[in-house]
Amino acid sequence: DVLHNLKIFFGYEQFRTYEGEALQEQAVQAAVKGKSLLAIFPTGGGKSLTFQLPALMSGHSVHGLTVVISPLQSLMKDQVDNLADRGITDAVTINGLLDPITRALSIQRVQNGEASLLYIAPEMLRSKTIEKILMARHVVRFVIDEAHCFSSWGQDFRVDYLYIGKFIRKYQQKKGCKEPIPVSCFTATAKQKVVQDIRAVSYTH
């Protein structure tokens, strides 16, 4: 039950709503049911919880790993730190800002199954080390934050984002997945052309 887990992990009695819409709960329920989704969330709208809660649930139930891809290294660290402040130590980030010792410890925590949430930048998917540690884990979902970076129509276009879909396909082939691994895309941009681009290259269609 997602409300039960919401209380256990985050201490909240209910999900937030936006102008009467239960966006948070809808996104969590879709993820828990194993669906891919594209969610348009307002900035500061409680988006993080909608992928963190299902990730923590699957981490505890099936020892799954959720891979969160974000272009903003400082925000990744903030999210990991915020979870740690709540006593949740399941999340790690591996990025270029880490010193060698911290990086090695983060890699070790993913390898030994302590982490159920891994935050990385899209360019890290080209790393053989990252590929190796992901191959050794049961990845249950890829979460793509700031998904408007897929779109050449947006001013935030990132060419590294175009590699994400290729990586997911390659990963599934190497793992011999019978079913596609679910993908969640999050953006604050509702422009139709941008949304079409996200669907086309993010592997959510």
Predicted feature residues:
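Conserved helix/coil segment N-terminal to the catalytic DExD/H
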Residues: P100-R141
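Conserved pre-motif I regulatory segment
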Residues: D1-I40
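Conserved SF1/SF2 helicase motif Ia
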Residues: L56-Q79, G87
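Conserved small/polar residues in nucleotide/adenosyl-binding loops
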Residues: T204-H205
